[in-house]
Amino acid sequence: METSSISTVEDKPPQHQVFINFRGADLRRRFVSHLVTALKLNNINVFIDDYEDRGQPLDVLLKRIEESKIVLAIFSGNYTESVWCVRELEKIKDCTDEGTLVAIPIFYKLEPSTVRDLKGKFGDRFRSMAKGDERKKKWKEAFNLIPNIMGIIIDKKSVESEKVNEIVKAVKTALTGIPPEGSHNAVVGALGNSNAGTSSGDKKHETFGNEQRLKDLEEKLDRDKYKGTRIIGVVGMPGIGKTTLLKELYKTWQGKFSRHALIDQIRVKSKHLELDRLPQMLLGELSKLNHPHVDNLKDPYSQLHERKVLVVLDDVSKREQIDALREILDWIKEGKEGSRVVIATSDMSLTNGLVDDTYMVQNLNHRDSLQLFHYHAFIDDQANPQKKDFMKLSEGFVHYARGHPLALKVLGGELNKKSMDHWNSKMKKLAQSPSPNIVSVFQVSYDELTTAQKDAFLDIACFRSQDKDYVESLLASSDLGSAEAMSAVKSLTDKFLINTCDGRVEMHDLLYKFSREVDLKASNQDGSRQRRLWLHQHIIKGGIINVLQNKMKAANVRGIFLDLSEVEDETSLDRDHFINMGNLRYLKFYNSHCPQECKTNNKINIPDKLKLPLKEVRCLHWLKFPLETLPNDFNPINLVDLKLPYSEMEQLWEGDKDTPCLRWVDLNHSSKLCSLSGLSKAEKLQRLNLEGCTTLKAFPHDMKKMKMLAFLNLKGCTSLESLPEMNLISLKTLTLSGCSTFKEFPLISDNIETLYLDGTAISQLPMNMEKLQRLVVLNMKDCKMLEEIPGRVGELKALQELILSDCLNLKIFPEIDISFLNILLLDGTAIEVMPQLPSVQYLCLSRNAKISCLPVGISQLSQLKWLDLKYCTSLTSVPEFPPNLQCLDAHGCSSLKTVSKPLARIMPTEQNHSTFIFTNCENLEQAAKEEITSYAQRKCQLLSYARKRYNGGLVSESLFSTCFPGCEVPSWFCHETVGSELEVKLLPHWHDKKLAGIALCAVVSCLDPQDQVSRLSVTCTFKVKDEDKSWVAYTCPVGSWTRHGGGKDKIELDHVFIGYTSCPHTIKCHEEGNSDECNPTEASLKFTVTGGTSENGKYKVLKCGLSLVYAKDKDKNSALETKYDMLIGKSFQETSEGVDGRVKKTKGKYVMPVEKNFQETTEGVDGRVNKKKKTRMDNGRPKKKQRSGRDDNQTRMQVELQEGNINSVIMHTVKNF
């Protein structure tokens, strides 16, 4: 017997450079597919597990991780649902611990802290998945360590194509720093032998990762590429390795120039020397004079004017230093072409208008960081056999340093020759405060800041990872104006004390810890300096909030940030506690463990007559604020951000108060809130979140003054009946979801882009709806009073998504032309005629009891990719579907009898995955089933051709699947058996260059007709035995059914599942290594049925089948050549159904001796027909065969051959054989 294919990995494992760890259901067909393509275009060999239901067995995947050099760990929302992802992550951590793997974490629409600390739904899914698993602790360690590596963040504002390029660049950079396997500089060798890669008698250089840095810098200085004089700036944060890089550059390049000079420590020298000494020092180095004078430069100028010079200036810190050297720099630029000047600084602004290009020194990658740390931690004993015992602790220090070379050097030196107990103790101390030697490095840059910049730096540390606009707004309302705040952020960015990424302000962890240390030192001195309090132990003492030691210290408290999740005991707050805090700007009582901030038990006891005279407060966050209103003495004159979720408030404050700076208000789930009158003067308000304020009935008319309001969330305000007439010109997002008493929607802004009216009581849209020319999303789901959609909706030229699900009384959809409409959801409506919109890509008509047929013109909807017809119980037939349709879901169409012939047009070049689902279509006629199977066969054949032609079958993936009621394996499957297991023997060269994919089939029966499931998946695991008797297992999906939207359903009838997957990667490797060898292969297949993540014992595989699919030979002119694998055995069964479906199948058997020549049939355009044999087995016994006449068939063969129907000719030939 014979089967599909897979190559062995034990014999010749593929040398993958990059392994991608990701959750397939989230990212496979979007982000990851683009990333894989980009990596391959850059000649980077990448491995991914290609199947959603887990393609490879875990041991194979773990082996792939070990064989890889780099891992991309992509954390997405549903990552922790998969135990496979987490076990891969555990392996990744182990390999990085051993120093054999570089991990690059990618946070896909997640915060790194969410992953690291397992917060929110991400953490909830992990705890649910890992419940009761003894490996939970190890997994948590992996989540704690891997996300701490400097990674790449992709949020909602990111342009994914740009992020893909950034990842590819990071991978290429990492690969260049990884020595070839077997070289002396490989990580394993470097960790085991301090002399690896060094010449005899030479001490190994104490830095790592400089080779690629030097190469990148040299590219910017290239004398062949850039003929003129060139000035390059080398920039980066303090301690990042600029000085080391420049010394290496100078050492390498000085021999290329007749005159060269290196002036280092310019920052320090400028403090002890007059600035006019700098040009004298430089000129002296260039001219080789001991005491040159700038006043008399004629001789040095004339001497050097015709020479190419190299000048390296290190640690430039002020504009005055540049100005002092300007005359000489200008002279160099005017001199002979080919000179090079390199200026290193930690202040990017100093290079503006001076340099031709800039090189930014980045953090070290994980591998270089580990090597550098180990070099200094074991500097006198590199061959220490106990080094492996320190590996886990080493990882902790490396993660702490986050690729910062100086920190790695300092920490390694402090731990050299120390015991493991000392290492553990040091790690605990670092959690409290950074090393003084690290602090001193940053202190130099901090001391050079102005007072305003220092305050801005320390304030930003309190709000890192927040939007830049938000941070600048907080700073602008402090001692700085708007322009000054923006200038402060830019200055700190230029000095690399902060950085902006995707619109957010970030700060390196070491700088963040440094900022806290600065505040702590300020408190421990005389108490006269303003400070910010982060640690709860500094805020709460003895069961009371006791920040104050005296009035002077209270007056200098600038911020209080209390994490309520860390408050274990009941704590009392005195009514006069804040009375002396006149300078308090930031007050936050929050919960870091619950992002939605809803589960906290409020352990802070607050008196009713609390005094809150906080005139200077800019940010007020108080989770579950217990009072009905803010105290009367509260003055919001400088308030920018007010967040009081789940509060007991009825109104903000009594009367009107000036709020000229207020921009963000969040009062979500304040269920007693009934008045918003306090916001009547908040004319600069931009975001207002009132979700879940169930008592709120109306908006004040004064809110029409909010001309800057862009976001208004009223979701779940169940008492809200209407909105006042107003024109909020900046409003872009309006959410009224679940406002069940809201009856009439007035047009309150012409600029709305996203409008959510789902679950409201509105019965019609406003008459002037056509004014919403920027509207992109309109959601009216579950508007049960809505009876019609006005034709003027067709005038909304920007509308892309229209959701009308469960609008039970909606019977007619107007004939409109919305040229950009991509998504139309009409499920649960009473519409009788399907609308035809040429641009629609996703159309949902499910749960419609009125539609009995679909329009024939649907085949012309070339953009339609997803058609949902689930539970359309009156639907009796479907017409031909368009060629680009990727998913058809007709589950539960109980009246469906017929389908079009052909079912859908197939484009010869299409490569998209497609799924056609007909589960629980109990009245489907036999002719319809035969057309579905015929379509599946044609689809497999054309897909094999397209994949081979357009990507050479490089990427293995599931390309087509279908399922429908039935009990037989289609006749075009070459191998069939009863039961769930199939054993085959494949002939020599079965894996030749034309093998494109594998077609699989399983007949599944439900043992308990009353059983209900939400998901059903059929997978096939097959093992291939090669000539060395080793087995390789490979798993791929056959087909699946999922009940979307929750709930469960019965699968009562037997169902046929057919799936086609492109050639697996392991087969490709086997093919490349053994294409000329003649090796028979044994294979076995096992089909299983799972519900969710575990095998479902209530479902049984009755029959199964296999066919290998081959693409046409590129040297032939036929449109397609399909060849079938054949069996070495005694049984024979023919295939007699052509591609066009016109030839009916017959079954039978011949019992033939093994020594007979059984040859496969492959028909080309030259008309030559070779013999082919095919076998069908029933429990290992051959079935009986009835022979058919040959004369009519011979005539038909000639006609078919003339018409180019090659596959029909093949089937006839086999039949007559």
UniProtKB/Swiss-Prot annotation:
EC number: 3.2.2.6
Active-site residues from the entry: 88
InterPro entries: Apaf_helical, C-JID, Disease_R_plants, Leu-rich_rpt_3, LRR_dom_sf, NB-ARC, P-loop_NTPase, TIR_dom
Superkingdom of the organism of origin: Eukaryota
PROSITE patterns xrefs: TIR (PS50104)
Phenotype upon loss of function: Loss of resistance to P.syringae expressing AvrRps4.
Family annotation (Pfam families): C-JID, LRR_3, NB-ARC, TIR, WHD_ROQ1
Chemical reaction(s) catalysed: NAD(+) + H2O = ADP-D-ribose + nicotinamide + H(+)
Keyword field: ATP-binding, Cytoplasm, Hydrolase, Leucine-rich repeat, Membrane, NAD, Nucleotide-binding, Nucleus, Plant defense, Repeat
Domain NB-ARC: 211-472
Limits of the TIR domain: 14-175
Family: Belongs to the disease resistance TIR-NB-LRR family.
Purpose: Disease resistance (R) protein that specifically recognizes the AvrRps4 type III effector avirulence protein from P.syringae. Resistance proteins guard the plant against pathogens that contain an appropriate avirulence protein via an indirect interaction with this avirulence protein. That triggers a defense system including the hypersensitive response, which restricts the pathogen growth.
Subunit structure: Interacts with EDS1. Interacts with SRFR1. Interacts with RRS1.
Additional facts recorded: MOS12 and the MOS4-associated complex (MAC) are required for the proper splicing of R genes and contribute in the alternative splicing of RPS4.
Domain remark text: The TIR domain is a signaling domain involved in cell death induction. It is involved in homo- and heterodimerization, but other domains also contribute to the interaction. The LRR domain may interact directly with pathogen-derived elicitors. The TIR domain mediates NAD(+) hydrolase (NADase) activity. Self-association of TIR domains is required for NADase activity.
Name this polypeptide is given: Disease resistance protein RPS4
Lineage, broadest ranks: Eukaryota, Viridiplantae, Streptophyta, Embryophyta, Tracheophyta
